[in-house]
């Protein structure tokens, strides 16, 4: 075992206790302190809100115009029937939407096994009771729309459908196949370390997925969402090339900024030397030919230019700039 303070322990799936086909306890350890709650809460939220599944979204019952009514010969009112339909656990194979039908007559229970479907639909709990018929001549005829989705989608979000016929009842769709989930964090020990976590997740599903597959899918979803952060190291910020000015700003300043003596300044202006860029391109010989500009003035000019890291006789390409020509 490494003793590095910065090295994280990697957990392993210790045990899957299968209490029933749809109920299991999953134990993960060892985890660094605090990671039990971090992972437990993240997985719990994903399992409850982000797992794909199937749900009844629309129902049509012959003779029924709205959910706040009852049907003669049926023990339950329509609201109860809709609640029972919401608890249907089924799987659609190869497609995302299926329309099923149900017809039953005579006294007795109406169960999920009475639903008429093709081989692409699997009903996980065929014994699930939908309603009870109380008279010999009573009957019920339903069309049931099932859709694939994830999370919770309220019926009100689909109320805007304009071509929805009267009598088509919309149901809140809870797509999650997870019925109950909780987690607990206990103390764990590895060799001499006793400050570790053990994560125990207990869950029940509706039978459309087993608990082990559910936890693996939730972990995959979490991992895929975090990949974007892992890939941050591979993202290269585009290099922003700073546009360098074509000319040193100092060269664009007027010679008056050099604060030369009046004599030297007047001599330069007489030679149409208005900018520092004009001045530095002149040589010493050229300046000495300027009327009234002697060696003393030349020395002054050279000293002032040197304080700005400039010299006489410099070559400046594309001088003068367009901006100076326009101003002139």
Curated annotation (Swiss-Prot):
Q: Which reaction does it catalyse?
A: RNA(n) + a ribonucleoside 5'-triphosphate = RNA(n+1) + diphosphate
A GO MF term: DNA binding
What InterPro entries does this protein map onto? DNA-dir_RNA_pol_insert, DNA-dir_RNA_pol_RpoA/D/Rpb3, DNA-dir_RpoA, RBP11-like, RNAP_asu_C, RNApol_insert_sf
Q: Where is this region: Alpha C-terminal domain (alpha-CTD)?
A: 247-328
Which parts of this chain are annotated as the region Alpha N-terminal domain (alpha-NTD)? 1-233
EC number(s) on file? 2.7.7.6
Query: Any transmembrane segments, and where?
Result: none
What does this protein's UniProt record list under function?
DNA-dependent RNA polymerase catalyzes the transcription of DNA into RNA using the four ribonucleoside triphosphates as substrates.
Regarding domains, what does the record say? Answer: The N-terminal domain is essential for RNAP assembly and basal transcription, whereas the C-terminal domain is involved in interaction with transcriptional regulators and with upstream promoter elements.
Q: Specify the protein name.
A: DNA-directed RNA polymerase subunit alpha
Gene (UniProt): rpoA
